[in-house]
């Protein structure tokens, strides 16, 4: 199995775009047919992250947990305005933050 699409629905689409852009996503505005305008970013050549406006005020899927590998965790935390102290783990430096909708996002900096 290979994941190729993640769709996040939100009532804070611009805040979400800013947050995930700070993590390295490069979004383009899209619209498919009569569907809503949304943002899409291709990650790692074949995984697409899309930000869509919430339908009828539905709550975001706050139970979702995303993991993002970053090059410099301290710089990333500063760029998203988070003051969490990263912890050393067996996988590298790790910090857990929340996106503007409250989803858990785990940041990981692999160390050699």
Spans of model-derived segments:
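Core segments of cupin and vicinal oxygen chelate
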Residues: 1, 7-48
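Short glycine-enriched loop/turn motifs at secondary-structure junctions
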Residues: 1-2, 58-63, 88-89
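Vicinal oxygen chelate
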Residues: 11-13, 66-104, 112
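Short solvent-exposed loop/turn micro-motifs enriched in small/polar/acidic residues
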Residues: 32-35, 88-90, 109
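Short secondary-structure boundary/capping segments
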Residues: 39-41, 56-58, 86-87
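Active-site beta-strand termini and strand-to-loop segments that position acidic
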Residues: 41-46, 97-100, 110
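Conserved beta-strand in the GNAT
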Residues: 49-52, 96, 105-108
